[in-house]
Amino acid sequence: MPKCAGPFSMIAAHFRKEKPGLYSDCEVIYVDDLRSLLYRLKDQRSLTKEEWTALIAGRTPELAEELFSLARQERHTWYGHDIYIRGLIEFTNYCKNDCFYCGIRRSNRNASRYRLSKEDILSCCRLGYELGFRTFVLQGGEDGYFTDIRMTDLIESIKKQYPDCALTLSIGEKSYESYQAYYNAGADRYLLRHETFDSKHYAKLHPPSLTAGNRQECLWNLKRIGYQVGTGFMVGSPFQTPELLAEDMLFIQKLQPQMVGIGPFIPHHDTPFAKEPAGTLELTLFLLGLLRLMLPKVLLPATTALGTIHPKGRELGILAGANVVMPNLSPAKVRGDYLLYDNKICTNEEAAECRALLEKQMAAIGYQVVTARGDSKMQTHVLTFEETTSVNISHHF
């Protein structure tokens, strides 16, 4: 097959490195069939499970480069060359859950635990606002200390001081009533990765107290309330297959979230999955491109995990179709303690340094960081109970 050409062949080179000798000349016809699936996805914004599986399992460097070109066209149509920044505040690494892949899981006695005070969090917001951030993301483990009363007080305080900013929460599974209380207090968006749609796969990644069904119900509740909703999954998690990824894409297709966050699985040394192989850059980039074709108006981050597994990971994510980056506004003294996975980047730089570095990185590939709320251009439709019941698909396709 011909060598990759074009300015983004650096991305395609990773396919050859990570999947050597997989393709032969006899597969050209099959690759042409996969190309037709790409264009069907672009035109119809949907595929069947079998088509998703074939596209993911049969990906090639040439197919990837064509995908990335299409994805960039879609992103430029709706968002131009603007890259939105979110100020990430990791305010607690206490968590009641014991997910098998997570470095802040309850059973990890080697984790150095911390909680930021309300004053600390507001200080992070103040610094972020001065640096031009207009979206703050409060992320943390499921920490019982932060009751609904404490959370609503915190949300109200942030929105009172920064009414022109969007506030995103990423604090896990809560009751409908809790989600409603946060929304009433002023929260705009909520990020909750579904991690994997398949219930059996979910059970291999989590203890019995956590289920795929409850996770998905939380997402439908968030949609029902009126949040701008974000979901997503790890790429290359243990036991993951192309068929399971196809189900993830079908679920996202049904959910129609305003944001999708995906990143490679990276093992943490103090978890049961410490010896498992990490997810790959090439598959993560390929899936980013597919997500952009399926949901052209979606907000799609180039995640910190991408930057962790490759020095140019975030830039490559942007070139694959992403349009969001999330610099860390947490105090430098605690960043090294919020380690969901090993070797996380940007744990030592000050917030201003992270912002300046990202601007340089984005400018080098022809994009510009903008200081705006950066709302999704997808419509936020408040689902009724009847609507969520009708679209809340079962655990089998």
Go through each PLM region and give its residues.
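Generic structural signal for well-ordered alpha-helices
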Residues: 87, 125, 152-156, 179, ...
